[in-house]
Amino acid sequence: MRIWLAPDHARLVFDLSGPAAHKVFTLDNPDRIVLDVENSTLKADLERLGLDKSPVERIRSGKNGKTLRLVLDLKHGVRPKSFDLKPNQKYGHRLVLDLYEKESLGKATKTAEPQAIAGRDIVIAIDAGHGGDDPGAIGSGRVREKDVVLAMAKELKRRLDQTPGYKGQLTRTGDYYISLRGRTTAARKHNADLFVSIHADAFKDPRARGASVWVLSSRGASSEMGRWLASKENSADLIGGVGSVSLDDKDNVLASVLLDMSMTASREDSRSIAKGIHTNIKRFARMHKSHVEQAGFVVLKSPDIPSILVETGFISNPGEAANLKTRSYQKKMADAIYKGIVQHFERKPPALTLIAQRKAKDNRSYKVVRGDTLSVIASKNGVSLASLRKVNSLKNDTIKVGQVLRIPAS
């Protein structure tokens, strides 16, 4: 029996020796949750669970015939959600009980108000793969993917937050699990301009090695477009990242065109950013392939947000696992991703962002007219004479009528 704490819920995981039917219900005054598990007995030590920061005060157990009853005495009311998990490579049958804070459910699907203010930050959603009961791949020396990628994600956020005009948003800040769709939902909630998912690869052959960068395949894009158009819930959502275009009031043809345009633009930006990151990583690390790869990963399927996935190396390879767990290598990888992101957005910033404003100022020009002098032009445009000379590669102050000068940012 284990417990994981996330910002909006606590997850209790019960390891089972086999499948078992169960039911959950709540009681009031005081707040309690009752979990009945048929044909079961309890072997876990409830006193050692570590409930201090959870909404659970204590857990009591009892038997009703062959049914095991667990009563969770709560510190405050929560909303339970339970489900079964089938065995995987690490765990056997499991029963999962998620306890959601009541106020978080109402907020979970709400998208933040679009940042329409000129000069806003470019928002990067940074997704550290796996977490909680899902450790991801486990490499030599028990290096866990979920730990390595969270460290890289935090370093990437630190770099972005230190750069004027950029803001990093982590999909998870600690060791807890978020569903695949929940990760992209979190990106949309923060009006992200880009979604970056960070992972570490694994393969049965420990000789496999190399980092890779992935974007959504065309097959994955077409299937996701159909899913969005077929879903009333999705069609009422936003497209266009921080825009506010809704599909729910459009006929099918127009909705299809709008969504296709959004996905095309998103995939073009994804490829551009992915190529830059691929180039940066291969300067210090071996790449699994010499090009950006494509697949239908669920986390890449946002129709309105450019999305990429970075496999930072094979954690199943002892040499790469040793690198991935070091702070210096994690910083190198985060720096390569950071540079690829910034390189793209400096070339193609979203509208109304601080970077777009700065680029517009950098692109100002002035056409010389009769009577102009270089010093007068500098004064008119609020820039120094030295900077005006430098940006135009002028060796002296001689200019000609009709000559077009670049005006540097003031």
Give each language-model segment a name.
Residues H22, A255-L354, R389-K390:
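Active-site-adjacent mobile loop/cap segments within catalytic or ligand-binding domains
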Residues R358-L385, Q403-V404:
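Primarily a LysM-type cell-wall glycan-binding module
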Residues P7-R11, S17-A20, D28-R32, S54-V56, ...:
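Extracytoplasmic
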Residues M1-I124, V376-S379:
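Signal-peptide-cleaved, periplasmic/extracellular N-terminal interaction regions immediately downstream
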